[in-house]
Amino acid sequence: MGTVHGDGGEDGPSWTRAAELLQDAAPITVQEGASAMTIHVHWEPGDPGTPPHRHSGPAFGYVTKGAVRFELEGEPERVVEAGGTFWEPGGDAIHYQDGNALADETTEFVVTMMCAPGKPMLELVEEEELKQRAHLRAPRPTA
């Protein structure tokens, strides 16, 4: 995606080539007093992942193995393969899917989340709210 420390060229110092930009998300909002946590998630083959939920702050993920089926409210479902990144703004947005897109391999990802003070890192969304917000979900793929 690009360099992080400027363009030192092929002959420049190694520190100008050592870091590769994988994701640049904007705008993000982090509440005063927020904390950050980084977790490693391991899904067995075909695991659908966490039920629809939201995070209290932004989350930034990197898939280390396999492929994640990712769906955020208002965005179409997509598959993020190993080496790919994802992010979500947190707050009110519903995260519908984060499961393993592969039926025969494990999937793993690392995610760093900013947690609003006094709030849980993850909150499941009740069925009633999902129905009320159905119009905000992107159209589902058809088989």
Locations of regions flagged by a protein language model:
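A short, N-terminal "cap"/entry segment at the start of jelly-roll beta-barrel domains
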Residues: 1-37, 79, 123-143
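A short, acidic/glycine-rich surface segment
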Residues: 23, 47-50, 94-99
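Short beta-strand/loop turn elements enriched in aromatics
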Residues: 30-33, 47-57
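Short acidic-glycine-tyrosine-enriched beta hairpin
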Residues: 31-35, 42-44, 67, 72-92
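Short, conserved beta-strand element in jelly-roll/cupin
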Residues: 42-44, 55-70, 109
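Short histidine-centered beta-strand/loop micro-motifs
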Residues: 50-54, 72, 79, 98-100
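Ligand-binding loop in jelly-roll beta-barrel domains
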Residues: 76-77, 90-120
